[in-house]
Every structure is written in C-alpha cells, then in structure tokens.
Amino acid sequence: TVSYRNNYDETEKEPTVLPSQYPNLLVNGAGGIAVGMATSIPPHNLGEVIDATNAFIENQNITISQLMKYIPGPDFPTGGLIIGKDFIKQGYNKGRGSFKIRGEIEFEEKKGSREILVIKSIPYQVNKSLLIEKIAHLVRDKKIEGIRDLRDESNREGIRVVIELRKGVEPETVRRQLYKLTNIENSFGFNTLAIVDNKPKILNLKEF
C-alpha cells in the first residue's frame, strides 16, 4: 500500500512514491530546476539497469565499480558517442560531473565519386531542426566551405542528415569543422539530486 499526500497547491492527492521493481528514476532520467536546486540525471538502458539491480540483490556489498560492469554509462535515445569514461565514473561515485557526447558523422560515397557526410546520431537534447539550420547558416556565412547540399532524410528507422560535398573537398576537414562550430559535440552535466525521505540528496549509482 502506498500513502497519499496533498499535491503542491493542496487541490488533490498524489502518491508519496511511485513503486517499481527497478530504479525507474535511473532508467528515465530527470532534469529541471526548482526552488534554487537543479537536477540532471541521464537516462539509462532498462536491461542494463535490471541486470545491475539483480546483481545488487544478490550482493548488497557490491561496489560502484562492480555495478559499472552492468551499467557502463548512460543510454541516450538520440544515440551519440560518450567521450570521457573517467568523468562518468566520477558522476556515478559522487553524483556530479560532466562528459561530452559526440554525434556520429560517417563518410559515404555517391555515384560519380562525389562524397557525402551523414549525421547518424546527435547528442541528447540537441534539436535536429535547429542543428540543420545552424549548419545552413555556417555555409551561407562561408564559415564552412565545400558543402554543396544539405537535406534531412531521417525516418522512423533513425536519424540521417545528408551533407553532400563539392568535388575535391576533404571530408575529414568538413567533419572537424562541424564538431568545432556546431553542437554535434556537446556536454552533459551529472547532478543526481533527488528527494529522499522528503530531503534533497545527491545520489551515487548504488543509492538509486
């Protein structure tokens, strides 16, 4: 049985907890600011969290390093590569930290030997439409040169933003410029503040 309490303006009742058999807060993640406090908890893979939960049940003395064998890092819905695993370890141990997420940009070759770059993932919370708009502005302002065409071919199977290059342009040069001048590479800050027993607390991985 779950106890109920008044909500923030006392107009209705709400459950004091939302019970589940795994740490749902860690799976879904959370972010926001209220009453001078902020939280930023990244989402995680459900299967990995359940495996770690089972390992914790079997061994209550399991360490955070051992839990990280099951949960190596966050799992973002928009994909991307996490850079800086030491910073993830710091976040899991202390509840605070920051790491970089880099969207994946791959090379492809079109007919006629014209090369293209394809953005296949973007950092968490980066707006794809605004990213494309930013690239278009950089091309227009000649801060990135060598791009012939830019189009969004994303569908239900995933993200696919095609950047068609002019002949003779070095793809790696354009890719480096995209990482430098846009938020295809972005930072995510750990701040695992949660309410525990009606008090704010910074949680480490094991405390979730």
PLM regions: where:
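Intrinsically disordered, low-complexity regulatory segments
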Residues: 3-28, 33-208
